[in-house]
């Protein structure tokens, strides 16, 4: 599975945030779509497999697990190292609350 840092995610990318709903509500990368890890297997059909799939969480652990899940099913995924914490720290566009 490919991994990029937060600064390498292109504008307008399909960015899937796998944190739980309450975490996503607190702070999120602008444009991210929330599909919590706990719901991921039942919602994987929501992904646009014709576009690159960037997966993000808080720091990079859960997103790596989801990325591995996708790769095992023949779906390419890109893990965003540093996660939402790194995204915010880098000053990238995000929403709080």
Roles of regions detected by a PLM:
Residues 1-14, 18-52, 61-97:
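Rhodanese-like catalytic fold shared by cysteine-dependent sulfurtransferases
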Residues 56:
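Short, surface-exposed ligand- or partner-binding patches at beta-edge/loop junctions that are enriched
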């Amino acid at each position: 599975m490919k991994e990029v840092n937060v600064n390498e995610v292109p504008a307008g990318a399909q960015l899937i945030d796998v944190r739980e709903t309450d975490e996503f509500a607190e702070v999120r990368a602008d444009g991210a779509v929330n599909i919590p890890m706990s719901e991921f297997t039942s919602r994987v059909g929501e992904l646009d497999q014709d576009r690159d799939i960037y997966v993000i969480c808080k720091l990079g652990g859960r997103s790596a697990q989801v990325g591995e899940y996708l790769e095992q099913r023949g779906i390419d995924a890109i893990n965003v190292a540093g996660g939402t914490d790194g995204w915010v720290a880098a000053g990238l566009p995000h929403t709080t609350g």
